[in-house]
Amino acid sequence: MILYKYTADCSKLNLEQEDATKEGYEGLYPRRSDIAEWNSKFYTAYRTEKKFFIMISDIRKDKMTIVAELEMEVDPRECVDYIRKILPEMELLACEEITSDEFYKEMVRTERNNWTECYIRSMKEDLKLATEPEHSYYEPVAYQVSERIYTSQDMNRQKQSEQMQEIMASESFYEEMERIYAPENEKRFVGHPVHYLITAGDKAAADDMIDILIPALLENQRLLSGRAYDVQKMTHKAEREGNFDNIFSGAKGGTVILSLEGEKSTGRYATGNYDLAKALGNKLNEYGNSTLFIFVDISGNRSVSDDTIAEILSNADLIQIQECQGDLKRASAYLKGLAEKTEYHDYTIDELTQYLPKEKKLYSVSDIYNAYNRWYGRGLKTHIYKAYKEKDLIKIELKKKTDKPYLELQKMVGLSDVKKVTDEILAAAKMQKMRKQIGRAHV
């Protein structure tokens, strides 16, 4: 599913304004007019052929906004040709890809203008625009999902190479870029020969790699869409959510980024995480030809075992891209690039590098981001909230206890009933853990 927003010149359509002197929302064209008839024709075409869904959502000062949803198999030119067939005097000025949230907002605008005969909420379900999990007062959400748009605008091999140097790209990343730009590849989309596993110590470091990877794939026509869903904090209940599948079906032609983090599990099959991993493997098998999968493995935050990862990845060929390490010179250049994007300007290189790990001679991208975050936080006091400039944090000294709580309890005089209950609880917990490790149900 690919979502577009078109801006068009409609001055030749001879639409009459209610009052040429009105401004803002009051300057809208008549609520019930030819626009409703045109939208009716677009809707009829959708119900008949199911190729694309087109809707006029707004008109202001001779500028018309049109949104369209296309199946990935449909040539965008076919959609444009149909718009021109219904509106021959209209001239398209611009086209951009939008998120599903933006698309739905335009649908709501159309409904409020009374320019459509279809029920918007029903169309949202029909187009599978809903991707958010259900919310509960008693349980955390099953997953978090966000959406962003990538473009290949102004992207070329030279710019891509410069960006790779800036992020201290690893050898594995350079090798994959060589394959993506290889002249023997045909520049057309027929499916995904490989998917990706990105390993990094920090989500921001992984995003830096993704921000280069997806535009490069777009430039080489390895993707039809620059729209990407970013799914994080998945729990074992994610696969049971009705909207979870919409993420993968709605991303056809585009990308799904899946962070392998969430609930910690005990043992390989102990929790529903294995079932979730198996479900992700099935999604990869089902949608892998039409949707690009990028798995993100953040060191120390992974919620599934190596065996479970292997279960997911067995459903397709994957290229692993790892974060790289660089010396102090490269780390300083990376930090400077991050610092230049902030409001702080009066800083020195020494101030940027003082938070890098002292014991290391080579620094990972994650080390650099950790140093940057500490430097930026310090800068809030010295540049923005200056009243805190000379204020240091209070350091609280904690008294170390030599014994563990259980041993301290046993040393106490009396409390025989409390000690007995504690022993029973610990025994039950050990039994439950043993059952988890062999894959049996919880007690």
PLM regions: where:
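Contiguous, function-dense segments enriched for cysteine-driven chemistry
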Residues: 183, 413-416
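Conserved small/polar residues in nucleotide/adenosyl-binding loops
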Residues: 441-443
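Structured alpha-helical bundle/scaffold domains in large eukaryotic membrane-trafficking regulators
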Residues: 347, 421, 434-438
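Conserved helix-loop functional segments at active or binding sites
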Residues: 427-435
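C-terminal helical "lid" subdomain and adjoining coupling/linker elements of P-loop NTPases
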Residues: 363-413
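Trafficking entry modules
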Residues: 420-421, 425-427
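ATP/nucleotide-binding catalytic cores
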Residues: 2-380
